[in-house]
């Protein structure tokens, strides 16, 4: 059993579509002996439209690709300078439900930002994490065969202007903020390390393997 083993993959900057496909493939082929994994990645510019997504929230996507995906939620933007943390966990083995995993993700963000004296918080009616009514992180998950994929997006040091082309997560006029502006993590390496540190505690992982990329590539 791989209950307390965690693999953390640093994937660098990647196009969205191949990583989404790899998440699905991993989830479809894993078994009860597969270790849980965290994937840290930075995406090329893309809008992703969740399963509940409505086209009216895509105001003016322009030259940025729009991809309809299988996570929950509405439309959001991913791009350079934003830290993605994908959580490929066997929820049945962890004995948690999707709601508890959402709470874990929110707490990882809140706890890592608290180390910089940033007071972040979650909202019951609007998933994600906020600072002074501005959104700093988005969440979206899918569970298949009792296992999760997708995860969180933390705004770190990025061009926030593409968010003006959409209603982020379906909320018109939602203001976005990033850690750089708040004297938090200034780069993805620092931001990602903080998120992973807090998730390791929640998983009670005793064997953590850090690696870059995928095997056989």
Swiss-Prot record:
In the reaction, the free carboxyl group of octanoic acid is attached via an amide linkage to the epsilon-amino group of a specific lysine residue of lipoyl domains of lipoate-dependent enzymes. Its main location: cytoplasm. This is Octanoyltransferase. It holds the Pfam family LplA-B_cat. Belongs to the LipB family. Coiled coil: none annotated. The keyword Cytoplasm applies. The record marks 135 as: Lowers pKa of active site Cys. The keyword Transferase applies. GO terms for cellular component: cytoplasm. The active site is at residue 169. Substrate binds at residues 71-78, 138-140, 151-153. It is found in: Cytoplasm. Catalyzes the transfer of endogenously produced octanoic acid from octanoyl-acyl-carrier-protein onto the lipoyl domains of lipoate-dependent enzymes. Lipoyl-ACP can also act as a substrate although octanoyl-ACP is likely to be the physiological substrate. Keywords: Acyltransferase, Cytoplasm, Transferase. It comes from Pseudoalteromonas translucida (strain TAC 125). Pathway: Protein modification; protein lipoylation via endogenous pathway; protein N(6)-(lipoyl)lysine from octanoyl-[acyl-carrier-protein]: step 1/2. GO terms for molecular function: lipoyl(octanoyl) transferase activity. Residues 32-207 form the BPL/LPL catalytic domain. GO terms for biological process: protein modification process.
């Amino acid at each position: 059993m791989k209950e307390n083993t965690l693999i953390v993959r640093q994937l660098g900057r990647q196009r969205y579509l191949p990583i989404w496909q790899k998440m699905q493939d991993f989830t479809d082929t894993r078994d009860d002996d597969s270790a849980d994994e965290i994937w840290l990645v930075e995406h090329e510019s893309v809008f992703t439209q969740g399963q509940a997504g409505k086209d009216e929230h895509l105001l003016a996507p322009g030259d940025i690709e729009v991809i309809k995906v299988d996570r929950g939620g509405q439309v959001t933007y991913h791009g350079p300078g934003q830290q993605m943390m994908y959580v490929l966990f066997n929820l049945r083995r962890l004995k948690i439900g999707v709601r508890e995993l959402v709470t874990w993700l929110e707490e990882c963000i809140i706890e890592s930002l608290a180390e910089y004296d940033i007071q972040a918080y979650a909202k019951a009616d609007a998933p994600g994490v906020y600072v002074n009514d501005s959104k700093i992180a988005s969440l979206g998950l899918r569970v298949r065969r009792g296992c999760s994929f997708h995860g969180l997006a933390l705004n770190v040091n990025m061009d926030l202007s593409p968010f003006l082309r959409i209603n982020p997560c379906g909320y018109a006029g939602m203001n976005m903020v990033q850690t750089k502006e708040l004297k938090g993590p200034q780069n993805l390496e620092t931001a990602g390390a903080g998120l992973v540190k807090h998730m390791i505690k929640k998983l009670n992982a005793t064997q953590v393997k850090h690696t870059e990329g995928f095997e056989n590539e």
